[in-house]
């Protein structure tokens, strides 16, 4: 009997229907799949039946030993590779060639892991299970109360879909929250057209206080009178909240702010 290690956020998926739905969500033309946190290898058993090469990253040494024994034939044939490491610490190896990410991500690392994959040019997309609250933030659209910087950063690289919810009863042990599976297909990179790190900081400030007006939040970064000119030109209410502005207008406003910054600091 495996003892669950809370420090790794372990909840093992046991529902066969959910596993099959995850497999069906993976595009057919994927040559290499990276699975993070295979656990007992229940989903891995289905992944190795696909035409793709599979690389698994398992942080738990005890589970790693079990996986080596369980998938001995697949390892010998070269179909499967299992690495005993924290995926975040082995990202260079993980990202050595193009891949599609599949994972039941621990809640405590989910957001950072997804953002890292989104920014990785070798990652062509992902199907991951995460806490529903986080899934909504990634998949929401402008106007939704949950619309966030995560959705905007994702939109720059591709399309995010919330595919389905997963009840806690599908896991052992059952988590205290509802999970959801999202799929991101990366088919563009609009971050190349802007100073990406500056844009991330711009969004961080814009969404720093979701209940306050966007105008007030951004006044900490951009001169208020310049913001008011932009809002008036675009016929925007001065009382709109961060979640109410479209991605296109966020990009336009950021570029205006960058132009203003360069005028104020030509050498910066």
Swiss-Prot record:
<feature type="binding site">
    <location>
        <position position="104"/>
    </location>
    <ligand>
        <name>S-adenosyl-L-methionine</name>
    </ligand>
</feature>
<keyword id="KW-0698">rRNA processing</keyword>
<keyword id="KW-0949">S-adenosyl-L-methionine</keyword>
<feature type="binding site">
    <location>
        <position position="58"/>
    </location>
    <ligand>
        <name>S-adenosyl-L-methionine</name>
    </ligand>
</feature>
<dbReference type="Pfam" id="PF00398">
    <property type="entry name" value="RrnaAD"/>
</dbReference>
<keyword id="KW-0963">Cytoplasm</keyword>
<dbReference type="InterPro" id="IPR020596">
    <property type="entry name" value="rRNA_Ade_Mease_Trfase_CS"/>
</dbReference>
<dbReference type="GO" id="GO:0005829">
    <property type="term" value="C:cytosol"/>
</dbReference>
<protein>
    <recommendedName>
        <fullName>Ribosomal RNA small subunit methyltransferase A</fullName>
        <ecNumber>2.1.1.182</ecNumber>
    </recommendedName>
</protein>
<dbReference type="InterPro" id="IPR023165">
    <property type="entry name" value="rRNA_Ade_diMease-like_C"/>
</dbReference>
<feature type="binding site">
    <location>
        <position position="13"/>
    </location>
    <ligand>
        <name>S-adenosyl-L-methionine</name>
    </ligand>
</feature>
<keyword id="KW-0694">RNA-binding</keyword>
<feature type="binding site">
    <location>
        <position position="11"/>
    </location>
    <ligand>
        <name>S-adenosyl-L-methionine</name>
    </ligand>
</feature>
<keyword id="KW-0808">Transferase</keyword>
<feature type="binding site">
    <location>
        <position position="86"/>
    </location>
    <ligand>
        <name>S-adenosyl-L-methionine</name>
    </ligand>
</feature>
<feature type="binding site">
    <location>
        <position position="37"/>
    </location>
    <ligand>
        <name>S-adenosyl-L-methionine</name>
    </ligand>
</feature>
<keyword id="KW-0489">Methyltransferase</keyword>
<dbReference type="InterPro" id="IPR029063">
    <property type="entry name" value="SAM-dependent_MTases_sf"/>
</dbReference>
<dbReference type="InterPro" id="IPR001737">
    <property type="entry name" value="KsgA/Erm"/>
</dbReference>
<comment type="similarity">
    <text>Belongs to the class I-like SAM-binding methyltransferase superfamily. rRNA adenine N(6)-methyltransferase family. RsmA subfamily.</text>
</comment>
<dbReference type="InterPro" id="IPR011530">
    <property type="entry name" value="rRNA_adenine_dimethylase"/>
</dbReference>
<dbReference type="GO" id="GO:0003723">
    <property type="term" value="F:RNA binding"/>
</dbReference>
<dbReference type="GO" id="GO:0052908">
    <property type="term" value="F:16S rRNA (adenine(1518)-N(6)/adenine(1519)-N(6))-dimethyltransferase activity"/>
</dbReference>
<comment type="function">
    <text>Specifically dimethylates two adjacent adenosines (A1518 and A1519) in the loop of a conserved hairpin near the 3'-end of 16S rRNA in the 30S particle. May play a critical role in biogenesis of 30S subunits.</text>
</comment>
<dbReference type="InterPro" id="IPR020598">
    <property type="entry name" value="rRNA_Ade_methylase_Trfase_N"/>
</dbReference>
């Amino acid at each position: 009997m495996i003892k669950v290690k809370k420090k790794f956020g372990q909840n093992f998926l046991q529902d066969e229907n959910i596993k099959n739905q995850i497999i069906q969500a993976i595009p057919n033309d994927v040559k290499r799949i990276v699975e993070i946190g295979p656990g007992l290898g229940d989903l891995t058993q289905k992944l190795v039946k696909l035409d793709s090469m599979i690389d698994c990253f398992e942080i738990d040494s005890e589970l790693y030993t079990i996986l080596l024994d369980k998938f001995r034939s697949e390892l010998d044939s070269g179909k499967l590779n299992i690495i005993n490491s924290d995926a975040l610490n082995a990202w260079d190896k993980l990202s050595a060639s193009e891949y599609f990410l599949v994972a039941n991500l621990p809640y405590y690392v989910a957001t950072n892991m997804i953002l890292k994959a989104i920014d990785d040019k070798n990652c062509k997309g992902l199907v991951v299970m995460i806490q529903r609250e986080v899934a909504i933030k990634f998949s929401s659209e402008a106007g939704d109360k949950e619309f966030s910087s995560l959705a905007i950063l994702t939109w720059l690289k591709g399309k995010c879909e919330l595919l389905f919810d997963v009840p806690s009863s599908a896991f052992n042990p059952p988590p205290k929250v509802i999970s959801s599976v999202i799929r991101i297909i990366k088919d563009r990179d609009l971050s190349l057209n802007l100073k990406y790190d500056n844009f991330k900081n711009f969004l961080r400030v814009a969404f720093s206080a979701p209940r306050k007006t966007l105008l007030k939040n951004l006044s900490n970064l951009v001169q208020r009178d310049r913001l008011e000119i932009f809002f008036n030109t675009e016929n925007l209410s001065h009382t709109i909240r961060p979640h109410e502005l479209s991605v296109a207008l966020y990009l336009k406003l950021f570029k205006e702010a960058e132009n203003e910054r360069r005028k104020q600091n030509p050498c910066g």
